[in-house]
């Protein structure tokens, strides 16, 4: 919100949603009230499949993942990153480059998530890094969790892309 407030060309309507309640968030504002949706992770992918409005994804950059892994650095237990491929691909890249001893578990959908985290618990993982839904599911199973957050730059990049898209649609590219 702070980044959008600095941009006079952006009128921002915010709704908080995740893989469990994305439909409620989408339906809470008339589609005629906005030109583009900005979201991240699996929620962005779900919205892109079902919303009639273009969806811009806040990507999880290597920097975002590095910050999240660094925040977990002092943790002594077995660590796993769980999420959709747009999150886990970055984690896998970093694990290989930095030689981090972490488990990376991609999921396809919400149904996969609970089973994946349950299996990770059985494998001895006790810290799960992921999105909001992963974090909540891990806590339901008695595991520690940390949210993978998006950097200011990742959000700024998504805002820039949204403005470019709307201008192109309006013929002002």
Locate each region found by the language model.
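Non-catalytic structural scaffold of enzyme domains
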Residues: 1-173
